[in-house]
A protein has these predicted regions:
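C-terminal scaffold of the Radical SAM
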Residues: 2-14, 26-247
């Protein structure tokens, strides 16, 4: 409801009817919306009826192209056959599924609520609901992740033939549980480049830990991703994003 109220307030702001301390006015004259992205958070916690209301509010304020690409992020742990069909009927034309890894151990380490099998079920539910444009989010350079494990994740996803694949390298952000556990390790890797170059006391400190991949391993994962996806016909359109021709 709050999001819908914000959308509905845009015409007033554009007409100069917003408070002095509000954001600068928008000039919407002549603008047509070609893409809409509903991100999160976890938008797939919303029922399809709520998504339909949000899109209706957008159309009341903006001129939306009839064939606009409308993307919604979805967590595989929350997407069901019924909700996938509901989102498609509500007007969503593209789903972005956050798999991150095909390794159960790596998923647990990331604190994800879904399993590999749940992702498969969600992907199939999306296809059955009529989604012919699906993105899968992946994450490399995870603690304890080997090049072989990353290659297995890529193989698993490529076999499903999604239209888009996003492959991001992990960034350990301050204020996150991962930073609490790996913040010092990140700083030491940035300083020394790899574990072999660290002082003996640090090598001993990290011995036996699920260590973050060093810079060379991270780079190898990136190049393997780029090479593998290119061979399968995916084109890179941003640094970490790949798509089949026409998408």
């Amino acid at each position: 409801d709050q999001l819908i109220r914000e959308i509905e307030s845009i015409p007033e702001e554009d007409a100069g009817q917003c408070p002095e301390n509000a954001a600068p006015r928008l000039n919407l004259t002549g603008l047509t919306v070609e893409t809409i992205f509903i991100g999160g958070g976890t938008p797939s916690l919303l029922p399809p009826s709520a998504v339909e209301r949000i899109l209706a509010a957008v159309r009341q304020v903006f001129r939306v192209e009839p064939d606009a690409e409308i993307t919604m992020e979805a967590n595989p742990g929350t997407l069901t056959p019924d909700s996938a069909a509901g989102y498609r009927n509500a007007g969503v034309s593209r789903l972005s599924l956050g798999l991150q890894s095909a390794s159960e151990e790596e998923l647990r380490l990331l604190g994800r609520i879904h399993t590999r099998e749940q992702f498969l079920q969600s992907f199939r539910a999306a296809r059955d609901a009529g989604f012919d444009n699906i993105n899968v989010d992946l994450m490399s350079a995870l603690p304890g992740q080997s090049e072989e494990s990353w290659q297995e994740t890529l193989r698993f996803v490529c076999d499903l033939e999604p239209e888009h694949i996003s492959a991001y390298s992990l960034i350990v952000e301050e204020g996150t549980p991962l930073y609490e556990e790996y913040g010092e390790m990140c700083a030491d890797l940035e300083k020394y480049g790899d574990y072999a170059s660290m002082p003996k006391r640090l090598q001993t400190k990290y011995e036996g830990c699920k260590c973050l991949p060093d810079e060379e391993t991270d780079r190898n994962m990136y190049h393997h991703t780029k090479t593998t996806l290119a061979k399968l016909g995916y084109e890179r359109y941003e640094i970490s994003n790949y798509a089949r021709p026409g998408y």
